[in-house]
UniProtKB/Swiss-Prot annotation:
GO cellular component: mitochondrial inner membrane; NADH dehydrogenase complex
Catalytic activity: a ubiquinone + NADH + 5 H(+)(in) = a ubiquinol + NAD(+) + 4 H(+)(out)
BP GO annotations: mitochondrial electron transport, NADH to ubiquinone
Name of the protein: NADH-ubiquinone oxidoreductase chain 3
Primary residence: mitochondrion
Provenance organism: Lemur catta (Ring-tailed lemur)
Function in brief: Core subunit of the mitochondrial membrane respiratory chain NADH dehydrogenase (Complex I) which catalyzes electron transfer from NADH through the respiratory chain, using ubiquinone as an electron acceptor. Essential for the catalytic activity of complex I.
Subcellular location(s) of the protein: Mitochondrion inner membrane
Enzyme Commission no: 7.1.1.2
Positions of transmembrane segments: 3-23, 55-75, 86-106
Length: 115
């Protein structure tokens, strides 16, 4: 007796919540929500706008540092090797390259947003 009542109640409640979730967003129409927006650029504008070289350099810098971090991720598993001194030397070299690259970008004002 309780099983049919529980099933009916849960199905009714589910259908009610799905109906409310379907109809409620249609009552509030936001113009910003339906306007196209691509990475801070207006996609409906001209395709020949000059591209900011600053965005490109920051993206390349991010990719390089991300690649170096990806090379450092397996180091905890590499610490189980027999040649621990070589693993620590390679890790130190990778971290030194990462720090030198960061210092170079900082000194060249590559991380500055305001010109």
């Amino acid at each position: 007796m309780n099983l049919p009542l529980a099933l009916t109640t849960s199905i009714t409640l589910t259908l009610l919540l799905v109906t409310i979730a379907f109809w409620l967003p249609q009552l509030n129409v936001y113009t910003e929500k339906y306007s196209p927006y691509e990475c801070g650029f207006d996609p409906m504008g001209s395709a020949r706008l000059p591209f900011s070289m600053k965005f490109f350099l920051v993206a390349i810098t991010f990719l390089l540092f991300d690649l170096e971090i990806a090379l450092l991720l397996p180091l905890p598993w590499a610490s189980q090797t027999n040649n621990l001194k070589l693993m620590l030397t390679v890790a130190l070299v990778l971290i030194t390259i990462l720090a030198a690259g960061l210092a170079y970008e900082w000194l060249q004002k590559g991380l500055e947003w305001v010109e």
